[in-house]
């Protein structure tokens, strides 16, 4: 720094070569010194710049951290605002729906009120009509009161008529009871009649069977009689040889061919039995 302000007069240059050499050395030394000073100045300037940059970097780092924190806060605030916006939107839509439903309900109520207004007019006309009808009925009631006052002396006859009506009602009830009994009896008789028809059909079938058996027995009896009449008369000697055995066989003393007579009697007894059986069944059915 001191070499920069030094001044060398021009007369000293021409003194001698030694002085020139010395001067050149001094100049070179001054130049080197100036270079070192310049380098030192540059280094100092760069150091200051670096220090300033470091300070700026620290400030920027602090500002970056602050901005980052502010950004996080802003993000959280934005999320909260978004949630609030969603809630507000949902609430708004719900309110809109509610308002719409209320509008529909109020419109329906308005229509109902319009209908009620028409019904109210009809009711008013009906009330007026009923008022006129009431007046007419009051007039008729007054007329009826007059007629009842006129008919009051005949109240004894009305009581007798009421008694006769009650008697007639009792007779009608008895007639209805008799009619119900007649219906039940008719149904029971119809049931018994159907049972009787079934029994008669069964008896007719049995009679047909018995008649067939009787015809068969009569045929057999006639065949037995014919066989007995066609048989030869035994000789006296043969009868004597057999003695009482012949009487035992033919029943003795004029009762010849007892088997044929017995068969005929059996047929007659069966016929009478069948007729009695049919009669008894018919009597039981009619009684039942």
Swiss-Prot record:
<keyword id="KW-0287">Flowering</keyword>
<protein>
    <recommendedName>
        <fullName>Protein FLC EXPRESSOR</fullName>
    </recommendedName>
</protein>
<comment type="function">
    <text>Transactivator required for FRIGIDA-mediated activation of FLC and for the expression of the repressors of flowering AGL27/MAF1 and AGL31/MAF2. Does not alter expression of known activators of FLC expression. Not required for the photoperiod response or for the vernalization response. Not redundant with FLXL4.</text>
</comment>
<keyword id="KW-0963">Cytoplasm</keyword>
<dbReference type="InterPro" id="IPR040353">
    <property type="entry name" value="FLX/FLX-like"/>
</dbReference>
<dbReference type="GO" id="GO:0030154">
    <property type="term" value="P:cell differentiation"/>
</dbReference>
<keyword id="KW-0175">Coiled coil</keyword>
<comment type="subunit">
    <text>Homodimer. Component of the transcription activator complex FRI-C composed of FRI, FRL1, SUF4, FLX and FES1. Interacts with FES1 and (via N-terminus) with FRI (via C-terminus). Interacts with SWC6, TAF14B and RIN1, three components of the SWR1 chromatin-remodeling complex.</text>
</comment>
<feature type="coiled-coil region">
    <location>
        <begin position="38"/>
        <end position="94"/>
    </location>
</feature>
<dbReference type="GO" id="GO:0005737">
    <property type="term" value="C:cytoplasm"/>
</dbReference>
<keyword id="KW-0221">Differentiation</keyword>
<dbReference type="GO" id="GO:0005634">
    <property type="term" value="C:nucleus"/>
</dbReference>
<keyword id="KW-0805">Transcription regulation</keyword>
<feature type="coiled-coil region">
    <location>
        <begin position="132"/>
        <end position="231"/>
    </location>
</feature>
<keyword id="KW-0010">Activator</keyword>
<feature type="region of interest" description="Disordered">
    <location>
        <begin position="225"/>
        <end position="257"/>
    </location>
</feature>
<keyword id="KW-0217">Developmental protein</keyword>
<comment type="similarity">
    <text>Belongs to the FLX family.</text>
</comment>
<keyword id="KW-0804">Transcription</keyword>
<keyword id="KW-0539">Nucleus</keyword>
<dbReference type="GO" id="GO:0009908">
    <property type="term" value="P:flower development"/>
</dbReference>
């Amino acid at each position: 720094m001191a070499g920069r302000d030094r001044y060398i007069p021009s007369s000293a240059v021409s003194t001698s070569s030694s002085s020139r050499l010395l001067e050149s050395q001094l100049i070179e030394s001054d130049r080197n010194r100036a270079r070192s000073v310049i380098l030192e100045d540059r280094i100092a300037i760069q150091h200051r710049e670096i220090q300033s940059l470091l300070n700026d970097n620290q400030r920027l780092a602090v500002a970056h951290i602050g901005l980052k924190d502010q950004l996080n806060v802003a993000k959280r605030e934005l999320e909260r605002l978004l949630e609030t916006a969603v809630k507000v939107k949902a609430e708004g839509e719900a309110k809109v729906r509610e308002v719409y439903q209320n509008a529909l309900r109020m419109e329906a109520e308005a229509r109902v009120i319009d209908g009620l207004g028409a019904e109210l007019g009809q009711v008013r006309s009906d009330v007026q009509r009923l008022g006129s009808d009431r007046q007419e009925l009051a007039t008729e009631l007054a007329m009826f009161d007059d007629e009842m006052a006129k008919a009051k002396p005949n109240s004894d006859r009305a009581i007798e008529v009421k008694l006769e009506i009650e008697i007639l009602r009792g007779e009608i009830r008895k007639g209805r009871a008799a009619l119900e009994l007649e219906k039940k009896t008719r149904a029971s008789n119809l049931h018994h009649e159907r049972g009787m028809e079934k029994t008669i059909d069964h008896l007719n079938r049995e009679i047909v069977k018995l008649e067939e058996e009787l015809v068969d027995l009569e045929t057999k009896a006639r065949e037995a009689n014919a066989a007995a009449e066609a048989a030869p008369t035994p000789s006296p000697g043969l009868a004597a040889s057999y003695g009482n055995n012949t009487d035992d066989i033919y029943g003795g003393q004029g009762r010849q061919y007892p088997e044929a007579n017995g068969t005929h009697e059996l047929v007659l007894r069966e016929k009478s039995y069948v007729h009695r059986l049919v009669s008894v069944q018919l009597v039981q059915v009619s009684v039942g």
